[in-house]
C-alpha cells in the first residue's frame, strides 16, 4: 500500500501492472513509476508468456509497446477480449510519432488509450495510480 500520485489516498492492490515492452527506457520508466507507488510490475517481451501469466494472475493494468511489439501487442489485445476474466482489464499503449498511424487501429482493437511516447513518460505515475484505485 502507498499514497497514489493523484492524492486519492492509499493504493490498495495486490495485483500487478503487466507490460509488453521491449524499449528498455520505457520499461525502466514503468518500473520506477510503479515502485514509487509500491506496485509491482511484470514486464514481458513475448505475448505467449504475457498471456500465460495473465490467465493465472490477472493484472489491474496492461501497458503495451505498440512501436517495438506491434504484432504481439495486437495479439495480446485480441486474447484479452476473448477471455472473460481479462476482458475488463484496461490496456493502454504508447507509440512514437513515426508510428502514429497505429494509434486508431489499437484503439479500435480495444486499447483504452494510446499515448505518444513523450506524453506517456510524463503521464505514467498518474496513469498507474488512476487504474490502481
Regions found by a protein language model. Name each.
Residues 1-16, 31, 127-133:
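Non-catalytic signal-transmission and effector/linker regions of two-component phosphorelay proteins
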Residues 24-42:
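Two-component/phosphorelay signaling modules centered on CheY-like receiver
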Residues 64-80:
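Conserved phosphotransfer microenvironments
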Residues 81-87, 109:
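Conserved phosphotransfer cores of two-component systems
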Residues 88-98:
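A short, hydrophobic beta-strand element within the central beta-sheet of small alpha/beta folds
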Residues 98-113:
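Alpha4 helix (beta4-alpha4-beta5 surface) of REC/receiver domains from two-component response regulators
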Amino acid at each position: 500500500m502507498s499514497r497514489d500520485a493523484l492524492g486519492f489516498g492509499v493504493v490498495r492492490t495486490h495485483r500487478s501492472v503487466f507490460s509488453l515492452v521491449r524499449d528498455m527506457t520505457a520499461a525502466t520508466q514503468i518500473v520506477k513509476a510503479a515502485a514509487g507507488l509500491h506496485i509491482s510490475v511484470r514486464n514481458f517481451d513475448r505475448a505467449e508468456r504475457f498471456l500465460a501469466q495473465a490467465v493465472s494472475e490477472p493484472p489491474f493494468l496492461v501497458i503495451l509497446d505498440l512501436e517495438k511489439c506491434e504484432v504481439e501487442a495486437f495479439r495480446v489485445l485480441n486474447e484479452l477480449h476473448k477471455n472473460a476474466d481479462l476482458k475488463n482489464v484496461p490496456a493502454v499503449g504508447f507509440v512514437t510519432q513515426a508510428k502514429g498511424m497505429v494509434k486508431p487501429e489499437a484503439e479500435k482493437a480495444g486499447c483504452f488509450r494510446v499515448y505518444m511516447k513523450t506524453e506517456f513518460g510524463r503521464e505514467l505515475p498518474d496513469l498507474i495510480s488512476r487504474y490502481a484505485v
